[in-house]
Design a protein with these regions (language model features):
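Amphipathic alpha-helical "stalk" segments
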Residues: 1-144
Length: 144
């Protein structure tokens, strides 16, 4: 198997895992068209785009941990985490789907569903709530 074939298999494996864990909820909330388009976008990412996505996630994690430790959902670390989260979504979602409303809706879904909440809270307890508050604050500032 070539390096490219391994990379494609790796992406497909992650898409399948994500579909199994979150697919029903995503399809219920946003529909098959958006779910399928998001999966296709992920399949189409190049190695460098995938690496960039991973780098964003690592930086998001570091900033969110710092924000929780700082205890400030509107501080520099938290707001940078919210910005990184938006950038991550733009790399993962179909082109043109991102909006402040969609970002805020997804963030609040994280709090409502333990599967989503546990992803960020595994980094540090309270991370999901800080991220959601930071996203709300960032998007409110942007609307002003």
């Amino acid at each position: 198997m070539s390096t490219e074939e391994k990379f494609e298999a790796f992406k497909q494996g992650l898409i399948d895992k994500n579909e199994k864990k979150y697919g029903a909820e995503v399809r219920k909330r946003w529909g098959d068209t958006i779910a399928d388009a998001s999966n296709e976008k992920m399949k189409g990412l190049t190695k460098s785009e995938w690496q960039h996505r991973d780098e964003i996630e690592k930086e998001l994690k570091a900033e969110l941990i710092a924000a929780v430790k700082e205890g400030n959902a509107t501080g520099t670390h938290a707001l940078h985490a919210a910005q990184l989260h938006a950038e991550y979504l733009c790399l993962s979602w179909p082109d043109g789907l991102y909006s402040a409303e969609a970002h805020r809706g997804l963030a609040h879904a994280y709090l409502a569903d333990e599967r989503f909440k546990s992803y960020y809270d595994a980094w540090i307890p309270g991370a999901t709530e800080v991220l959601v508050d930071a996203i709300d604050h960032l998007l409110s500032e942007s609307a002003d």
